[in-house]
């Protein structure tokens, strides 16, 4: 189903509103939600880390887990994500976040054009 007159997609898989950090890619129903995510993820990371540090002082990098949480708070109508060009489930992206906690930093998010199928296949190799 194409985009509505107000620029909203009814199917996340067709959406052109896409952000990526190089490994993970999130899809949004509208440009408003995409902008809300891009404008707020840094602040949410800080707040998320403060909450975790109140409970326990951890050397782990919780940024990706914070970003997934923020995405699910912002995009209320569904969840569609890719990991390295492959469709992924909510559980799989959380496992990925747990694996990246030992990396010293998490890449920032940026808008990207939705990759075509040929480009996705290249990134999977």
From Swiss-Prot:
One GO CC term, this protein: DNA-directed RNA polymerase complex
Gene Ontology MF terms: DNA-directed RNA polymerase activity; sigma factor activity
DNA-binding region boundaries: 77-96
Keywords, comma-separated and alphabetical: Activator, DNA-directed RNA polymerase, Early protein, Nucleotidyltransferase, Sigma factor, Transcription, Transcription regulation, Transferase
Domain of life: Viruses
Pfam families: Phi-29_GP4
Tagged with keyword Transmembrane: no
InterPro entries membership: Phi-29-like_sf, Phi-29_GP4
Described function: This protein is believed to be a positive regulator of late transcription. It may function as a sigma-like component of the host RNA polymerase. Binds to a region of the A3 promoter located between nucleotides -50 and -100 relative to the transcription start site, that presents a sequence-directed curvature. Full induction of this curvature is needed for the transcription activation process.
Family membership noted in the UniProt record: Belongs to the podoviruses GP4 family.
Protein name stated in the entry: Late genes activator
Taxonomic source organism: Bacillus phage Nf
Phylogenetic placement of the source organism: Viruses, Duplodnaviria, Heunggongvirae, Uroviricota, Caudoviricetes
Gene (UniProt): 4
